[in-house]
């Protein structure tokens, strides 16, 4: 059995879930996407808090977008703080692109252009639903809960 086959089997066996899950993408080996080697996250392992960290250009925003889209598809509400506006495209279906089709073919997942329910909240005077309280108004006791 080749190294690639061993890797594929390791990923597919390790990503079996008894409950509901979301698929983040496909695993990579030596910089190559392994088609249908899906990376799944069981919904029961996702809690209220998470951290996605990395250097510029490593896919943090795309990871957040994929998580938000998949959770929305499962009916789970998501709150994202998007100061730069990178995730505003969630509200509109993608017009599609050859690179997107190529990437999805490598992953082994079909691409479906669709929009997601988005509610824009704001702390400033910009467009959006104005939040009536700021973080400083909550106080340390409420924030610690």
Task: Please report, for each region that a protein language model flagged, where it lies by residue.
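Basic- and hydrophobic-enriched, low-structure N-terminal and domain-boundary segments
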Residues: 1-55, 62-74, 78-79, 84-115, ...
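ATP-hydrolysis module of ASCE/P-loop NTPase motor domains
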Residues: 123-145
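Short, charged, low-complexity patches
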Residues: 60-65, 136, 140
């Amino acid at each position: 059995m080749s190294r690639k086959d061993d890797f594929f089997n390791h990923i597919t066996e390790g990503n079996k879930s008894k409950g509901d899950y979301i698929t983040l993408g496909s695993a990579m080996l030596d910089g190559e996407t392994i088609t249908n080697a899906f990376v799944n996250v069981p919904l029961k392992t996702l809690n209220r808090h998470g951290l996605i960290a990395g250097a510029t250009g490593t896919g943090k925003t795309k990871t957040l977008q994929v998580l938000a889209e998949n959770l929305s598809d499962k009916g789970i509400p998501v709150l994202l703080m998007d100061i730069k506006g990178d995730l505003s495209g969630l509200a509109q279906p993608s017009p599609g692109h050859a690179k997107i089709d190529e990437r999805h073919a490598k992953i082994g997942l079909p691409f479906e252009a669709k929009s997601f329910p988005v509610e824009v909240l704001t702390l400033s005077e910009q467009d959006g639903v104005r939040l009536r309280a700021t973080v400083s108004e909550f106080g340390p006791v409420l924030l610690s809960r």
